[in-house]
Amino acid sequence: MLNKKSLPLFGIDVAILVGGLGTRLRGVVDDVPKPLAPVLGRPFLFYLLDRLALRGARSVTLCSGYMADFVQEKTGSEWMGMPIHHSVEKKPMGTAGDLALAKNFLQSERVLIMNGDTWFEPDFKAFAEAAEGSEFCVAAAQVPDASRYGTLEWGSDGRLISFKEKSDTHAPGSINAGVYFVSQNLLASLRVEPLSLERAVLPALTLERRVKVFRTDAPFLDIGIPQDYAAAADFFTQLEISPHSMFPDFSDMKEAAVKLGTCIVIFDHLGRILMERRSDCGWWGLPGGRVDAGETIIASALREVAEETGLQVEITGFLGLFSDPRRRTVRYPDNGDLRQLVDAALLASSIQGNLTTSSESLDLRWFSPDEVPLNTVPPVVEILRAACSQTRNTLLR
């Protein structure tokens, strides 16, 4: 069975800094905090939470201030099976002060910190490995024009040497992506007082050569200024994670019919998961479908797997019953029907057969958990989290 650590952020608590005023976006986005600015009709922060849930983060703490009640109302206390905590500053505390306020929620050996107005998707597994043994590890993003950020300089040992100031020269460079791994010891040393992580803590650690750099070419987006915010829609579209009309955000469910189905997590001998690229939306999901009249859940699962993948499988366990309407609402494109999915999730292993696509799938592929595509259908994410952490017999509402 799968090693739990195959999930790149398994056991990691994450802090997202969402307390800024967003003054540079005034006139473009005025009625919501910057991290909740809409992109393709959906709050920017939702994309970050989707990604962290998919990557297996143990929990997320939102460090807020400006319009904190609104942030809490929109995000709630759970996201696709991932707990969400809220830490609220009563007065401006700076980023380091905000983290100090949130310490009780951040208990993992290393804590991942990120800004709520940037998107950066490094190889989290490699990033975590690079951060081992260090107090502070900063991710360096490569951008075509580093003039507005300033750049990072590091030595052959991978330790940060200095920050170069912003310049008028429009040239590519390595910048601070605003994503960090911080040790529990360093986090514990922060005091609840106004203090900037970027302007005070990080420079002081740099002088003592205590900061490691993780360089990556992963895509980077900062929505802090109007022109970059305007580019966010194309950015997410190119990543194939723009919202799909098949998966509306939870709203009025009175018109929805409840559909009982199965969802099957099939592992191979390498611990990889079989996923199918759905023909109805182009996103990745798991084999499964409706339980027909006269069928048992097991019979339905075996039939759906055979029809959609060409495989014969052995059911090895019951993972849980998943029914949360906030993440399991689907509008089918062929007839417009709105359904709330209630899925019996089962574990299985392949016995025989050759992978064969069907009318319901564009592609079939085995993925290790840290390679699961970003454009995975929302109802599947919490099932994958449970399967990869070996959580069994759980009723998720």
Regions found by a protein language model. Name each.
Residues 1-16, 24, 38, 42-115, ...:
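Conserved N-terminal catalytic core of the sugar/cofactor nucleotidyltransferase
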Residues 3, 237-265, 335-336:
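Acidic, metal-coordinating catalytic segment for phosphate/diphosphate chemistry
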Residues 27, 91, 141-143, 169-171, ...:
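Short Gly/Pro-enriched turn/cap motifs at secondary-structure boundaries
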Residues 112, 119, 125-129, 144, ...:
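Catalytic-core segments of class I nucleotidyltransferases/pyrophosphorylases
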Residues 133-142:
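A short, conserved acidic/glycine-rich loop-to-beta-strand motif
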Residues 149, 177, 255, 261-262, ...:
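Short loop/turn microsegments at loop-to-beta-strand junctions
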Residues 160, 272-273, 355:
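Hydrophobic "anchor" residues
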Residues 291-315, 322-386, 396-397:
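Unchanged
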